[in-house]
Amino acid sequence: MADGSSLLFRLHLEGVDIGSRADDQAKAWRKHSDDFVSLFYDGHHCFTSLLAGDRAANEKLLDNMREFIAGDRKGWNKEVTAKVGVPLVEGITAFADGDYDKSVDLLQPIMSDVLTMIPVKKKSWN
């Protein structure tokens, strides 16, 4: 799902009319709004929901992330969701809303963490 979502987002950023193609992707992501398996996937879920115009799914993802980090779980996933995941989703959302200053303010401090999550970037280091 991540590859399809990424392609749609890149095409959208290039000005290509993707029509309703993001709708099916967003629908598939909705099933994973509380998985917290990977921030890489959470980011894709976020921008695909926004591309499809599904603000409710994006807000649910963000609410679930906040609930996850507020809970009594311990460990790396909770810490990285708090440090990187929530700002990542908030930053993507701000970008989609056209609030570029806010997007930069949220994303700039976590960029080095975000870059370590990108599989293509990891492959290019080898």
Region roles according to the model:
Residues 25-39, 63-80, 108-120:
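Solenoid-like repeat scaffolds
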Residues 1-31:
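Long, internal scaffold/assembly segments composed of regular secondary structure
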Residues 55-58, 65-68, 80-88, 95-97:
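Long, positively charged binding patches that form subdomain-scale interaction surfaces
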Residues 3-10, 43-44, 48-51, 84-92, ...:
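"A position-specific structural signal for the A-helix of alpha-solenoid helical repeats
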